Amino acid sequence: MKYNKKILKNGLTVITSEMPSFESATALVMVGAGSRYENKKNNGISHFLEHMAFKGTKSRPTFMEVAGVVDGIGGEFNAFTNKEYTGYYIKAGKNNIEISLDLLSDMLQNPLLDAVEIEKEKGVIIEEINLYEDTPMRKIADIYESLLYGDTPLGWDIAGEKDIIRSITRKDFVSYFDSLYSSSNMTVVLAGGIEREAAEKLVEKYFVNMKPFKTPKPPKIKENQKVPKTLVRHKKTEQAHLALGVRTVPLDSPERYPLFVLASLLGGGMSSRLFSEVREKRGLAYYVKAASDQYTDAGSLVITAGVDPKRAEEAVEVIISELKNLTSGKKKIKAPELKKAKEMIKGHMVLELEDSRSVSIFYATQTVLREEVLNPDQVLKKIDRVTERDVMKVAKKYLSDKTLNLAMIGDFKDKKKFERLLKL
């Protein structure tokens, strides 16, 4: 699944990925504008702006007119906000790609940002925040990253805080939009049943008037953790949720591939080490999984689990014991286990990329965040090349007491009982 890259005169990057057997096509616009570009006064505005983009343009002044365009072609449209980017996409029949580009370009060049709609949408955003607060399985990731990155934009919640959301004005939106929504800070990806040259001409037609300008860079993370840290959020829940992890590497590090395999080996499937020990052997958790996450200047290997609150300490002990068993060599990585961990990653990736939307996100995130853009085959080969020695090297290097972090949500008032467990 190859791609073509073209940069227009206004600095806009265009990626096309032809998938000849597909009857559908996705048009995605990704902007290098996420919550880590915010400050204390406008935290949450990246996500809020994503909502407002659908609320009307100069030529389509209402949400119903915007939505009607997509409904009229039987498509789906949505958007998503990350800490480092925001994406807007429409997926529809391949013959409707021009309609998709027309609408997306209109939304991102001519948003009304109507003051009345802003006030109305504040209620929606606040209820979304409430939803996250009442969903501890999701909220635990936010708490974990606040522990890792502290009082910095990378440590703040993407949705923001309610009081800040209530205070945001139209002027704030215009200022934020005008500082980051530049053609030179944008990537358009077209994936699916498209023809490259025709698709590139359509992008140029609808985005040619966008202006390039220099955009600000977010503050870099300075990591100097030397002791383990714990953060416990007290909440009366039937199930406790934990995130236990260590600091690792940023997005461009070659070590990220061994870390992907390490995460897969530990908690990538139902036969993984942690699933076997924590759930199957001891019945401590409903879910337990591991992931390796990266930003442009930071990264983390994190294990998450939903556990019986009365046995939460035992669950943490078992997880840490498994990490020790790995780094000490007590439980060696054998060839079949390594192969299975790699095949798990590869299989999930292949299945995910059967969808043109996933393909568009795959290329867009790389283009916005990285110097190098790889196609799926290149990524799969990098996973294949990971050896047992590579995995053990990153395990011993990063699974350390000094950068160990534990976040928990549950009916706990004393974090000291968990702090004493954080020894690798």
Task: Please place each PLM-identified region on the residue numbering.
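Charge-rich, well-structured scaffold segments of protease-associated domains
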Residues: 2, 7, 18, 65-215, ...
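N-terminal glycine-rich anion-binding loops that anchor highly charged ligand groups
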Residues: 15, 21-23
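A short acidic-to-branched-hydrophobic micro-motif
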Residues: 27-31, 104, 240-242
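Phosphate/diphosphate-binding glycine-rich loops and adjacent basic-rich segments that engage nucleotide
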Residues: 227-238, 245, 254
